[in-house]
Amino acid sequence: MSTATNPLDLDVCAREPIHIPGLIQPYGVLLVIDPADGRIVQASTTAADLLGVPMAALLGMPYTQVLTLPEAQPFAVDDQPQHLMHAEVRFPQRATPPASAWVAAWHLYPQQWLVEMEPRDARLLDVTLREAMPLLRSVERDPGIAEAAVRVAKGLRSLIGFDRVMIYRFDEEWNGDIIAEARKPELEAYLGLHYPASDIPAQARALYLRNRVRQIADVGYQPSPIQPTVHPQLGTPVDLSDVSLRSVSPVHLEYLANMGVTATLVASIVVNDALWGLISCHHYSPHFTNHAMRDVTDAVARTLAGRIGALQAVARARLESVLLTVREKLITDFNDAEHMTVELLDDMAPDLMDVVDADGVAIFHGNDISRHGTTPDVAALRRIRDHIESEHHEALREDAVGALHVDAIGEVFPELADLAPLAAGFIFVPLMPQSRSALLWTRREQIQQIKWAGNPQLAKLEDIPNSRLSPRKSFDLWQQTVRGRARRWSPLHLESARSLRVLIELMERKRFQQDFTLLEASLSRLRDGVAIIERGTANAAHRLLFVNTAFADVCGSDVAELIGRELQTLYASDAPRANVELLQDALRNGRAAYVTLPLQVSDGAPVYRQFHLEPLPSPSGVTAHWLLQLRDPE
């Protein structure tokens, strides 16, 4: 452990192995059983008192000697883990039964069985799933996520009696905010507060996704160690990921104590297999929640998650319908046009903005730029394109249907941070790289006022000299003004932009193929040798797109062998450098060239020919193809 006093990197907390603490909470008992012979190989120190057997004698005993189950013994059907719900259990070795009935839950794995036991606590059994049914039915009818969240917070608090119940929602960066709250009137309100991602690190979120309901009955508990600390056969600490009794990280316990919280109950809100948020319940005195009440909480969380998923699906379907209508209109306009031109895209500008819900759109054709809606000026737009092409062009070209997007321009391109007021967010879609045609959608900056529960910049764990990791202690309201960010582009809007790119490219290819077929038919009948050269890209050289028979004869090759070959393979490698550079310069700048080079004939020594290169007309005004003729030198 470092003794520096500087804030640690958050990875320090994220690396804490919270799934193998070697400890459980002391209100219960854990046994680890070898499925091969049913013998107990590990146990928590609380087991001896409950089972009436000293620890030394307990280890190695068949579990059937210390547990009496009302149902058939558990068994593993296959290699997949099984989790058996709580059922009453008795202890035949005890001289007198415990004061309260106990229940056991089984976690069956191929190499070990885990049995966790806890008191039933009959005083709490008046809260069952039956009492929760009116709440569940109402949540299923709520018209929005906000309404459902408020209903759950109020309804669950009335059912399980916690001092405070909150609905906690994660954002894309795993920061959280309280969107609904029910609390005792004398408690400070947390509604609307935000919490940094470091408060719930990645490995904790992974456990929330796996183990849906967790409680801490008293943050001041003294944990019960598991003995021995390492499994005798497996040689590893026991994995408690699925165990409700798992002891909590000391860092988290101190975090709760710093908030003044004594007991918690947390249920995961999982939507489409992703952790959407949490139902977080706080109590300010010790508070044990038995398995029946936890089952009620789990049912409420799952119902809320189902409603959130359904409402999100409806919203997505509505948005998809709107975007589909816009795309269909664009398809009709494309089909009615002879070619994809700047004027055509300019006429479509309102629909182009609607298709991704943008504030503005810029249309690039070579060095020409047209603007619509709210965008930066032309000079600023050129700066954006130049940065994209210089830093991200490789990724864009590798993704055939890619769309580069940002929500905070200054975070990706610090040199462009000054453009945030009008272009904090953008989507860049290249259409025809060889002609530098592209669409750039923009969104304006949205200034946000965020209320944090404590300064998020001070939320990192601190390494205390000669001590241990310590969480933050301040949760005082801290307001932050967030600038430089736009509304986030939703997956649907990004998908819509990609679909539009594919549509435009397909339309252009269709038009080109029609024109090329006519040109090919005409060129094939010529007696002179001619070829069509296609402009290359940063990742591909200029290539032969078409050759007629006469051209192939001059090269001493077949037509099929020549099509697709790189232009540079036509002339010898020792060709005069100055002439090669003249040819390449013409190709780069879309100009004509007349250069004498040694033609590499397949069946003999190079023969000097004059390469006549003429650019073919292009609707975009940027040369993408050339007509090549090979002539005798003058």
UniProtKB/Swiss-Prot annotation:
Positions contributing to biliverdin IXalpha binding: 13
Location of the region described as Phytochrome-specific (PHY) in the Swiss-Prot/TrEMBL record: 325-508
PAS domain ranges (all copies): 13-118, 515-590
Post-translational modification: Contains one covalently linked biliverdin IX-alpha chromophore; present in the crystal structure as a mixture of Pr and Meta-R configurations.
Annotated region (Tongue domain), positions in chain: 452-480
PROSITE patterns assigned to the protein according to its UniProt record, in alphabetical order: PAS, PHYTOCHROME_2
Name of one Pfam family that matches: PAS_2
Deletion phenotype: No growth phenotype in liquid culture, slightly better growth on plates, strain loses slight sensitivity to white light. In planta is more virulent, with increased growth in host (A.thaliana) leaves, mutant opens leaf stomata better than wild-type, has decreased leaf callose deposits, produces more xanthan than wild-type and is insensitive to white light, has considerably increased sliding and slightly increased swimming mobility, generates mature biofilm in the light and dark.
Residue span of region PAS9, output module, not required to bind biliverdin IX-alpha, required for dimerization: 515-634
CDD domains from the UniProt entry: PAS
Segments forming domain GAF: 151-305
Miscellaneous information on this protein: X.campestris pv. campestris colonizes plant leaves and is responsible for black rot in cruciferous plants (Brassicaceae). In the cruciferous model host organism A.thaliana, morning and midday infections result in more hypersensitive responses than evening or night infections, suggesting light plays a role in virulence.
Similarity comment: family membership: In the N-terminal section; belongs to the phytochrome family.
Domain comment (free text): Composed of 4 domains; in the N-terminus the PAS2-GAF-PHY domains form the photosensor while the C-terminal PAS9 domain is the output module. Long linker helices serve as connectors within the GAF-PHY and PHY-PAS9 domain pairs, forming a helical spine where the dimer interface is assembled. Thus both the photosensor and PAS9 domains are required for dimerization.
Protein name as annotated: Bacteriophytochrome
Organism annotation: Xanthomonas campestris pv. campestris (strain 8004)
Gene: bphP
